[in-house]
């Protein structure tokens, strides 16, 4: 989806993609800052998710996201990421973000943390190291689809 697309084009491409990919639990905007800043355009995506019975996750790639307002006006529930883990590849920064995620989880029962585990950076290694530690402390890991089923689906 690109910013110059009309809502009719957005509707067509999202439906075509859903048919091509097959059953999905939900979708998110990965690099969709410009789309999420448009309440009309992101509203079309959220409306499709609502009608399909799938979740929408706002990755919050921009502070100017209109997704929450669009969802509110549609009466739709969306998910929003709480923490972006690897905005930098610096190990200390990633660990700090992970700690922020733990604090969010302690506060609200879960935290949606996103990152790039496949990108060759430090995140995959850090997660591999800390997974058993966090599990031993009582934390569990889930997909967003799993959260949707347990907390909001």
Question: Can you say where each PLM-predicted feature lies in the sequence?
Answer:
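C-terminal domain-boundary segment and adjacent tail
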Residues: 52-62, 119-153
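Extracytoplasmic/secreted cell-surface and envelope-processing proteins
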Residues: 35-40, 66-67, 121-127
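His/Asp/Glu-enriched short active-site or ligand-binding loop at hydrolase and phosphoryl-transfer sites
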Residues: 47-94, 139-145
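Catalytic beta/alpha-barrel core
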Residues: 6, 28-38, 50-64
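Alpha-helical scaffold elements lining the catalytic groove of polysaccharide deacetylases
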Residues: 1-19, 36-41, 68-105
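Conserved, mostly hydrophobic/aromatic
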Residues: 27, 112
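C-terminal transmembrane helix-loop-helix hairpin of multi-pass membrane proteins
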Residues: 101-104, 108, 115-119, 123, ...
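Sec-exported extracytoplasmic/periplasmic mature domains
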Residues: 18-26, 47-54, 72, 103-106, ...
């Amino acid at each position: 989806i690109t910013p110059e697309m009309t809502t009719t084009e957005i509707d067509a491409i999202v439906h075509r993609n859903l048919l091509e990919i097959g059953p999905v639990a939900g979708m998110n905007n990965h690099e969709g800052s410009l789309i999420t800043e448009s309440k009309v355009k992101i509203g079309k995506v959220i409306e499709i998710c609502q009608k399909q019975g799938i979740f929408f996750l706002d990755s919050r790639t921009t502070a100017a996201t209109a997704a929450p307002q669009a969802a509110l006006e549609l009466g739709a529930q969306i998910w929003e990421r709480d923490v972006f883990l690897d905005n930098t590849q610096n190990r200390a920064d990633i660990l700090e973000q992970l700690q922020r995620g733990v604090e969010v989880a302690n506060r609200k029962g879960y935290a949606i943390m996103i990152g790039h585990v496949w990108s060759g950076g430090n995140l995959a290694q850090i997660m591999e190291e800390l997974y058993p530690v966090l599990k031993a402390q009582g934390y569990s890991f889930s997909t967003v689809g799993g959260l949707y089923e347990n907390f909001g689906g």
